Amino acid sequence: MALLRGFLVCSLLLLSCICKEALGTRLLGGLENASPEEPGVARALQFAMNEYNRGSNDMYSSRVSEVVEAQKQIVSGIKYYFTVKIGRTVCRKGATDLENCAFHNAPKLAQTMTCTFEVYNIPWRNFISLEKSSCT
């Protein structure tokens, strides 16, 4: 019995060392940097921009000109945190392909802002929500 208990303790110790090594210093549930090219990250940012444009009173659509920071956090779904620079495009609202819309360059029409977005996604429930949005 003592031998079995000792084996179990050693096994648990070994397993915890392996898990710590595999996870590194990253905390479970903690924020981690994310690549804007990851499909889930790109979809979340696209959703945030669609919501931003829908809620904006501007007659022109805006789009991301630079991703300053993208992070994600595993919770009871995935939370995405973005800091982006956005600019006003020459395309009016309702345009479907904003990626091909040029930015305004006329001083009176050009407008750039830095925005932060928080998007909450539960993929297995087909749920996505813009939790926070702020632009300056």
Curated annotation (Swiss-Prot):
Organism of origin: Crotalus adamanteus (Eastern diamondback rattlesnake)
Similarity annotation: Belongs to the cystatin family.
Record-annotated site: Reactive site: 29
Tissue specificity annotation: Expressed by the venom gland.
Keyword Coiled coil: no
Function in brief: Inhibits various C1 cysteine proteases including cathepsin L, papain and cathepsin B. This protein has no toxic activity and its function in the venom is unknown. It may play a role as housekeeping or regulatory protein.
InterPro entries the record matches: Cystatin_dom, Cystatin_sf, Prot_inh_cystat_CS
PANTHER family given in the database record: CYSTATIN (PTHR46186:SF2)
Gene Ontology CC: cytoplasm; extracellular space; vesicle
Disulphide bridges, residue numbers: 91-101, 115-135
UniProt protein name: Cystatin-2
Signal peptide range in chain numbering: 1-24
Predominant location category: secreted
Pfam (any one): Cystatin
Domain Cystatin: 29-124
Keywords noted in UniProt: Disulfide bond, Protease inhibitor, Secreted, Signal, Thiol protease inhibitor
Compartment(s) of residence: Secreted
Disulfide bond recorded as keyword: yes
Residue ranges that the Swiss-Prot or TrEMBL entry lists as coiled coil: none
